[in-house]
Amino acid sequence: ADGMKFLVKEHMVPRRADKLIFEVSPFLIVSTTLLILGMIPLSSGIYATNPDLSILYIIAIFGIAPIGVFFAGWSSNNKYTLIGGIRSAAQLTAYEIPLLLTLLSVAMLTGTFNIIESVHFQHTAGAWNLFLMPLGAALFLITMIAEVERVPFDMPEAEAELVEGWWTEYGGMRFGMLFMAEYIRTYAACFLFTHFFLGGWHLPFQGLIGSIPYLGPAYLLIPGALVVLIKAWLVFLIVFVWARFSLARIRTDQILEFGWRMLLPLAVLQVVLAAVYRLYLFDVDGMADTVYGGTAWDALGVPFLVPALTTILWLALFFLLLNDTGKNERTARMYHVQTVQPAGTHLPGQE
């Protein structure tokens, strides 16, 4: 119904807008979004294309989005769209780097840049990447929420300040395309999280439940594509919907500080941890053929809890160092927002 409504509505171009860039920007945003979605497999045998460097391909496509967003805001010749475009470009740039470093850590741990092979790695290791690199999973979810500009990172579209942000001047099907692109990127984020951290199309406890008489064969008959869809739907429901209804919008300076000062060092830390895990916890010559790991976890006799414990230790040290600065030093930063005199404390005539 909404699609038909947008389709029949009139599309108008602002009088002094840069018409070419104004018209091209929505198609640039939607096309890059569809390119990401086209790289995501539903199972080991159901996919549109399967290049060996599919993770690198996704990293490259993600870098195009800020360009289209800024062009859309700038070309409209509107102060609200320009402010929204600048906010969006700054936010996407700040969170793009931690996202790319997180994807790089996934490739380092799994030893491949191919999405399907990274899913097979989790099956062979006998553990999802969610448990092998919990910090990476948290970083991926946070950065993807910021990438799709969902609550609480929706400051570029703040209705109370900027009407509709950088897509204020778009109407008709162009507005519908931008609206569609936002949700497609959200669904693509859920699918990518499913493949990178939740084992993709492999069932949970597949080896344990699969060995149960009568129940096991029926359990293993569940199609892999259905498993992926259910996992992605649960990620969308638990993460994106919960965040939308539970969290409040945060200021632009807080968004940028959180991305540059907290997520970026944590992403670099995750890359280092992934390299250590790959070199010392897994056999670099290849994974075992058994479901539960074999050489994967017996290479040095290291227990399964090592990734979780080392992540917690490094996080504790990081936050201790992060909070070492005093309050006066933090408030002296040029981007810190403070109120010298609280509003409403003066009586009329006493300003």
Feature names for model-found ranges:
Residues 1-351:
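Selective transmembrane helix interface/packing segments
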